[in-house]
Amino acid sequence: MENFKGLQKSLYIWTDSADLDKRVQQLKSATGGDVALENVHRLSFSSYANSSFDLIVIECAQLTDSYVKLLHMLKPSGKLHLVSFIGPAASLLQEIKLSGFINCREDSPDALTAEKPGYETGSSARLSFAKKNASAVNVWKISGDDEELIDEEELLDEEDKQKPDPAGLRVCSTTGKRKACKNCSCGLAEELETEKQSQKANETAKSSCGNCYLGDAFRCSTCPYLGMPAFKPGEKVQLGDNLLKSDI
């Protein structure tokens, strides 16, 4: 009872009326406050308001359906003290915890104490994690001072830096494109034709399938070069007279 000093309002729930006055006086002396009385069998019919008592003392622990009610009757951080309980203390402590009490402990072989949390049952509190910290650094934002810029000159190789031949940039005075018009009189048509003929002369000779010079392993079944050794691309190969005659 020494831990209950200073509690102003207490409720004593009794089962045996013998020496009841003596026990009540002991509780008053320990707390220094007022003590109300209630019979354990009348507890379910009582209509105490929520948060009415700082301390509730019970002589009997056979209240499996009343611990939640006692929790509501206590003020925040109020205490529940059980004496002369029946059954194992561990089982009773677990039952009290499941009813919402905290700091449940066994004071002695025949006494238990528990506390109501320091807030009212059903109360709520605003959570602070939704608040934005104005000074917080947005790590996803990239600072311009930390950017590594690519040197534009490194994107160009030596060929890109060479100036084009002005002769190859000549365009038709009529169309504005490097394509001669129908009645070209500026000389672009002749120039393009010369380039075309020069390109044809430099092209590598190719067969229809492009594999004749590689050898029989790459030639088609009707190739006239079947049976002949491989030759270099563009090399002149003379076919026999028998290959130039029709089989029919």
UniProtKB/Swiss-Prot annotation:
Residues involved in [4Fe-4S] cluster binding: C209, C212, C220, C223
PANTHER family: ANAMORSIN
Similarity section: Belongs to the anamorsin family.
Alphabetical list of HAMAP family matching this protein: Anamorsin
Domain of life: Eukaryota
Functional description taken from the UniProt entry: Component of the cytosolic iron-sulfur (Fe-S) protein assembly (CIA) machinery. Required for the maturation of extramitochondrial Fe-S proteins. Part of an electron transfer chain functioning in an early step of cytosolic Fe-S biogenesis, facilitating the de novo assembly of a [4Fe-4S] cluster on the cytosolic Fe-S scaffold complex. Electrons are transferred from NADPH via a FAD- and FMN-containing diflavin oxidoreductase.
Gene: CIAPIN1
Cx2C motif 2 (motif): residue ranges: 220-223
Region span, Fe-S binding site B: 209-223
Keyword Iron-sulfur: yes
Sample GO molecular function, one term: metal ion binding
GO biological process, alphabetically ordered: iron-sulfur cluster assembly
Coiled coil segments of this chain: none
Region spans: Fe-S binding site A: 172-186
Motif placement: Cx2C motif 1: 209-212
GO cellular component, one term: mitochondrial intermembrane space
A UniProt-annotated Pfam family: Anamorsin_N
Domain notes: The C-terminal domain binds 2 Fe-S clusters but is otherwise mostly in an intrinsically disordered conformation. The N-terminal domain has structural similarity with S-adenosyl-L-methionine-dependent methyltransferases, but does not bind S-adenosyl-L-methionine. It is required for correct assembly of the 2 Fe-S clusters.
Keyword annotations from UniProtKB, A to Z: 2Fe-2S, 4Fe-4S, Cytoplasm, Iron, Iron-sulfur, Metal-binding, Mitochondrion
Keyword Transport: no
Description of how the protein assembles with itself and partners: Monomer.
Protein localization: Cytoplasm; Mitochondrion intermembrane space
Annotated source species: Drosophila yakuba
Region entry Linker, spans: 130-161
Region named N-terminal SAM-like domain: 4-129
Cofactor(s) needed by this chain: [2Fe-2S] cluster; [4Fe-4S] cluster
Protein name: Anamorsin homolog
Binding site for [2Fe-2S] cluster: C172, C181, C184, C186
